[in-house]
């Protein structure tokens, strides 16, 4: 009954702060409960939570899953003190929250790790890839080694019915972030959008939906997909190929911080310290561990998105309006 009551109180508070939780999960039965508000799929981080509570029978973890934009808005509205940790892959929104004073300081142990202003800790890296259905693309798949090659291939496709998908930057904070990073790295970004739109471009909210479309054959390719969401599907989808372009491969940091209203800073910091520990990292998928930077890579260099004030620039309303003015023109040009 205690857990049901706590769950009801937290979910009621979340709804009052503009959140529409995608799920609420509990790991462990200890009375010292740390509550995490995050964007990541619970199944992918549950092993880390399980390892944390196994170290002490007094500990438990409650995880509330929601979208990055709703989490950002809820933090700004003022979180209930029961929320101990905020985790998100929308690193630009996270950096802005810290800059605006919504975090608490990390421990000395954590400030030695990759962090921003001693308050935001990086605990995972998500490499970004392009996904293709080789049954639809055919032998050409081996030629798609770079974004330039992809653009040229799209130009050469005259047959009808070719479809593609990518994040919709209006729906997805991660999609907007990746679009901005592509613009910084690649002068051909808008040309790529032009060529995708010349066929049938279907912007999407989520990596999972994009992957489903490629697996089913509804889309021939998905641009800018989170790699760790793809790898569990490969054994059951032999037609699916991952492309790691040789020009660059973005990687999104997953980050966490202790919100300023949190009651139990010490327990929150214990959880964050476990996430970046060797034991915690070993419980994550190998594709997202911080050591992914050291792996042999079939494509170009992995370029992690750096924690810096530069991430905040494109969140300016004028900059957003300018981007979406061009996005609307280019993404709908041939549709």
Segments from the language model and where they lie:
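Early extracytoplasmic/lumenal segment of secretory-pathway proteins
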Residues: 17-96
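Short beta-strand->loop
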Residues: 104-110, 119-122, 238-250, 259-260
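A bilobed periplasmic-binding-protein/Venus flytrap-type ligand-binding module shared by bacterial periplasmic
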Residues: 129-136, 178-180, 252-267, 283-284
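Extracytoplasmic ligand-binding site segments that recognize negatively charged/polar headgroups
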Residues: 39, 46, 82, 89-90, ...
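A ligand-binding cleft/hinge motif common to bilobed small-molecule-binding domains
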Residues: 91-96, 215-239
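Conserved C-terminal helix/tail region of periplasmic/extracytoplasmic solute-binding proteins
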Residues: 313-335
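N-terminal signal peptide c-region/cleavage motif recognized by signal peptidases
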Residues: 11-13, 17
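Mature extracytoplasmic/periplasmic domains
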Residues: 259-315
